[in-house]
C-alpha cells in the first residue's frame, strides 16, 4: 500500500515489538517532539488512535497532512479537546470506527486468513482471572486477554 508505518507510545518499552510488527519509525510521545518528527516525514495520511488520551488528539491532528484522517478505534469515556481550526483549514477528518457489523467482521477475518495473520494474545490461567482483569484495566496487557479454563 506504500505506507510508512509510525508507531507512537508513551514510553520506549513497546518499541521492539512495534518494529517487529512492521513499524518503520517509533516515537515516544513523552520523550520526543513526535509531531515535528512525523511532519518531517511528510505528515501522516492516517492515524489510528487505539488508546485515547485527553491531551493527545490535538497533537495527532497537527501531525496529519492536509486531508489526513484521525480514526478513533478505542474509547475510555473521557472528553478529548482539539482545535476546530486545524481540522477545517487543514481539511482534516475525524472518524470513529467499531467492528460490530457482521459483514465487517467477516471481511477482517477473511483478510487475516488470506494474509496468514495470527492473533497475538495474552493467556491467563483461570486462577489468575483477577490479575488478567487488573492488567487489562490498567493498560498492562499488551494483547487481547484470554482466560484459559
Predicted regions and their residues:
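Adenosine-nucleotide cofactor-binding segment
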Residues: 1-59
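Rossmann-fold dehydrogenase core element
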Residues: 69-71, 81-122
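C-terminal hydrophobic helical "lid"/dimerization subdomain
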Residues: 58, 102-149
Amino acid at each position: 500500500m506504500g505506507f510508512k508505518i509510525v508507531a507512537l507510545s508513551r514510553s520506549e518499552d513497546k518499541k521492539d515489538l512495534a518494529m517487529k510488527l512492521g513499524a518503520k519509525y517509533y516515537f515516544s510521545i513523552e520523550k520526543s517532539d513526535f509531531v515535528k518528527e512525523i511532519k518531517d516525514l511528510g505528515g501522516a495520511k492516517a492515524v489510528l488512535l487505539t488508546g485515547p488520551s485527553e491531551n493527545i488528539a490535538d497533537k495527532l491532528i497537527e501531525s496529519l497532512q492536509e486531508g489526513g484522517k484521525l480514526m478513533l478505534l478505542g474509547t475510555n469515556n473521557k472528553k478529548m479537546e482539539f482545535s476546530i481550526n486545524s481540522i477545517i483549514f487543514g481539511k482534516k477528518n475525524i472518524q470513529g470506527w467499531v467492528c460490530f457489523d457482521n459483514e465487517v467482521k467477516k471481511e477482517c477475518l477473511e483478510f487475516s486468513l488470506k494474509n496468514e495473520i495470527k492473533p497475538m494474545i495474552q493467556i491467563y490461567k483461570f486462577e489468575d482471572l483477577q490479575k488478567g482483569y487488573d492488567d487489562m484495566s490498567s493498560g498492562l496487557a499488551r494483547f487481547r486477554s484470554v482466560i484459559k479454563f
